Every structure is written in structure tokens, then in C-alpha cells.
Amino acid sequence: MFNKSLYNHPWEITLMGVFNAATESDVAALELEKVSKKLPTAFERDDKFFANIKKRDADVISNRQMRVPIELRPGGSFQYFNADGGDLGRGGAPYFDKAVLNCVFVSQNIEYTKLNQWATDDSRKAIISSVRRYTATALDELRRQLDSQMMQAGNGVVGVVSVVATSGGVDTYDLGTDGFGARLVRYGQTIQVFDTTLATLRGSGVITFWDVENKQIKVTPAIAGAVAGDKLVVNGITSPTSLPAILGVPYHHSNASTGTWLGFSRSTTPEIRSNRVNAASAALSLPLPRLAINKIGNRVGIDENTRLTAWTHPAQAQAYEEIGQLVSIINKEPREQSLNMYFNDNMQLAGAPLRRSFNWDKTRIDFVNDGVWGRAEILPIGFYTTDGRKIFEIRGASGGVATADIFYMVAGLQTYVSNPAATAYIDTLAVPSGY
């Protein structure tokens, strides 16, 4: 028989000896482990602007330059004349020219070991098949990267270093200089570090820490000589100043009077410059969007600015909302009412529908004319294939097959704007607190 113990022990001393009570650790090997069937994603794959551009049918081209004809200048010779036998003189004609472009090629590379594949290839082993997940999301990730590329000026710059700290062979970069922070780069991405002039390559490394909220990344290995002001450039670009990347919004929406645009000299061809409104680091105010749209009308005519969409970061949408809140009136009715001091998504800036993208420069609002934006394509987005194969084995150091596979999502494309004068932008806007 067992006697009730006066002590809280997992054992009991009786006349018949010492008896031990089994504890949970004695049966841990029998317990089942519960794994949630849900697989949340702790990051985003936003591709809002690229998806908007991709809606249009692509111009399928070869590796030869694509030509985009433009009626660049009016012509003819206007005059008064003497109808009583006077000489009408000679005349002229409108002037036509062309913009030229070539496609560039990009890839998203996914590599995994065979053990990775075999350990998850059955529902009895894992909640999902890792390889199926990789193939299902690779296209989304490539589109996300392409959306980031739409935010750079053709030089491949995806970040500007504001602070450098090195410890244990790892560089920590704060990216607080521009309006993007760490938004245009991704964890696991190989990036190159160039000096501020984009003339000197300091080195390259892999992003092993990615903190979007605090605009900070860590790069392994540490890059010798990296300093504040250096620029992060996408891997595969050797000469950023030659503009070898996708030509994004800042390239086409620019009123710069130096450099080139699709073969034109910006200094001698003002017709191909976009329309700029400089906010001079001030907060968004109501006259700025109206001025931007009126600049378009001044260039291309009052009836040619009706297809505009205002693209911006949600930070500037908030700034616009706060302007509206200052002039809002709440009419209280004699019944219980809910309170919502915020506006819905149907905002407009001077008549242009407002579209938000977290990948956008926080200091800019771009008035995009969908009628003049285009996309050239030599290779549609998809798997890189050879003889029908989409997945390729990795080779080991001996020359034999390594227990790892790789596949590539690829694309060959370029963007163009057929009439930059029909676009406008507001830049150097103050960013609301908290962003």
C-alpha cells in the first residue's frame, strides 16, 4: 500500500521500499510535435508599379535597337505677307527624330541542396514541399525586384550609405540618405559598393541582415574602404555611369539638362525633358500638384494631360490626407455614429487618381501618363530553359555532380517613354515624421 506523503517529492518511501513517480521527461519521446499548417510570410513582394507597366502589351524586339519615333519640333514658317504682289518666301516642316533603346537581361537565381528537397517532398515529412514553394514564389520575387529597378535611374543604384560600422568581418550600413532606405534591396542579395561618383568599385558582398524599418543592412564580408556616401549597385553591373540597367522612373521623369535620354542630348534637346516642381524640402501643399499638371499642359496642350496617375509613397498620401483633415467638418446627428477621421483610397491630386507604392521615393510624387509609358521585350519573364530543362545540377570541385540544384527566373526587357514632356514630378518633398 502507498502512504500519502507529507512532502512534495516525485518519490515515496514505504515499508516496501522506495517508489519513483514517472515525470514528463520520462515520456517526452512519446509526445507528438504539432506543426502549424499555416505558413505566414514575414516580408512583402509588392510589384505595384511594374505590374501597372506590364499590363500594356510589350513591343517584342530583337537585339537590334528599338526606335521610338517622336514628332520633336513644330515646323513651317509663319508670317504676314503682302497680298498685293508680295513674295511669300520659303517655308519649313515639322521635325521628326527617334529615341533608341536595347533590352537588358535580369535573373533571379534559386539554389537548394538535395537534402533540402528530399526532407520536404512528402506531406508526411513537411507541411509544404520546399522546391514547390521555391518555384511558386520565384516569379513573384523577380517581379518584386523589377519593381525596385523601376525606382532607379538606369545606373543600378539601390541604396546610399549614410553610416558605416565594421565588426567581426561584417559591415553595417545605415541607408538614411535617400527616400528609399533599405526598401530596394533584399535579404540574401549580392550587392556591389561603389564610391559616390560610381567610378570606383570598392567590393561586393551578400546582405546577411535586412532591417527595412530602421533602414539598415549588414554585408558579409566587410568591404575595405567603404564610407558614408558610397552607393549600393545591383550585382552584374560593371559600369554604372553608362546606364546599363532598366531605365526606371527617375530616368524618364527628369528635367536634367546634362547627360542623355535614349540617345538624345538633354542639354540641346529640351523637348525630351520632363516637368519638375521643386518642393525645396517643404511639406506637400495644394499648389504643387496643380503646378505640376499645368506644366504638362504648357508643354503638350491642355487636352493631353487627362490620363495622368499620381504615384507616390504612402507617406505623401498621409501628408495629403492631413491637409484634408484640417478643413474637415463633422456634422453630428442625433443618433449614435461611428468616427473615422481618415479618407478612403479614392484620393485625387488635382484630378489625377492617387496610387500608392511602398517602393516609391518618399520625397517624390510622379505624375505618370500611361499613354506614353511602354515596355520593350526580347525575353518574356519565365524559367531559363535548355533543351526543355528548367532545373540544373551543380557540379562539385571534382567535376562530379554535387547534391544541389539551381534554377533561374529570367527576363530581357527595357522601358521607354514616348513623350517625356507629357510627364511631371514633384521632388525634394519633406517626409512626414515616422517614416
Where are these predicted regions, by residue range?
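Core alpha/beta structural scaffold of self-assembling particle/tube/pore-forming proteins
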Residues: 2-79, 92-435
